[in-house]
């Protein structure tokens, strides 16, 4: 889970990242060593230019082989470069429709990449991200919702001007990234029998349902949660 998960063929045997495994043995600690080989600045810039939905990488994206087998870096399709750089790998294959599922190979790559991504979508620096994530974890586990919401505003209110497109999707991407970093059981836009909630977060002691409203009120969001049966 930490260092394995690489597959280069639908029927291929899973492979470990040898660099990370060797470093873990040397340090006698299950750390995050992937980013010692370099930071994906170019890839993140490519993602920004293409306006690629980061949630697809987090949840796993289904594509044809042609979607990730190109060797050119194109802003309209950053997936080949992301795949060839080792940040996503083959996670599944449906032979009936010839669709591949691509996703992060393991937790080391997932959390390392998303942690590096935060400053590109918010004004929260890379050094500050870990601090806020730790605080988020404490606040949700203790049920301190007010403190959690105040801290979440730091990520939303500090969105750089050139990225502030005032769409629910953009804010939801930030939220999705934050909670993936938390390592919580997290699903975005979870569908229920009568609709879908924007986000549902499960902790050991509580379930939090989030409904995003840029132009609406909190009362309207709560009413929608009740009426559509998100709980």
Positions of PLM-derived features:
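Short intrinsically disordered, low-complexity coil segments enriched in acidic
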Residues: 1-5, 213, 231
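Amphipathic alpha-helical segments of the small helical/lid subdomains adjacent to P-loop NTPase cores
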Residues: 1-23
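Extended alpha-helical interface modules used as scaffolds for assembling large macromolecular complexes
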Residues: 16, 21-223, 227-229
């Amino acid at each position: 889970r930490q260092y394995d998960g690489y597959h280069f063929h639908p029927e291929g045997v899973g492979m470990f990242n040898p660099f990370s495994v060797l470093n873990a043995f040397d340090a006698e600690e299950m750390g995050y060593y992937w980013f010692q080989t370099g930071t994906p600045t170019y890839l993140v810039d490519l993602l920004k230019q293409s306006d690629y939905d980061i949630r697809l990488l987090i949840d796993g994206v289904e594509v044809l082989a042609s979607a990730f087998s190109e060797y050119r870096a194109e802003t309209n399709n950053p997936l080949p470069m992301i795949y060839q750089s080792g940040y996503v790998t083959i996670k599944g294959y449906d032979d009936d429709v010839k669709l591949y599922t691509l996703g992060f190979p393991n937790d080391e790559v997932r959390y390392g990449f998303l942690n590096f991504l935060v400053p590109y979508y918010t004004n929260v620096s890379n050094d500050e991200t870990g601090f806020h994530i730790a605080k988020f974890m404490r606040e949700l586990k203790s049920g301190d919702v007010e403190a959690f919401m105040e801290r979440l505003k730091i990520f939303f209110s500090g969105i750089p001007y050139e990225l502030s497109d005032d769409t629910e999707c953009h804010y939801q991407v930030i939220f999705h990234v934050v909670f993936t970093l938390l390592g919580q059981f997290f699903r975005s836009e979870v569908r229920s029998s009568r609709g879908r909630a924007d986000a549902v977060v499960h902790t050991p002691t509580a379930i939090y349902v989030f409904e995003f409203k840029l132009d609406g009120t909190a009362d309207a969001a709560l009413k929608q949660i009740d009426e559509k049966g998100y709980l």
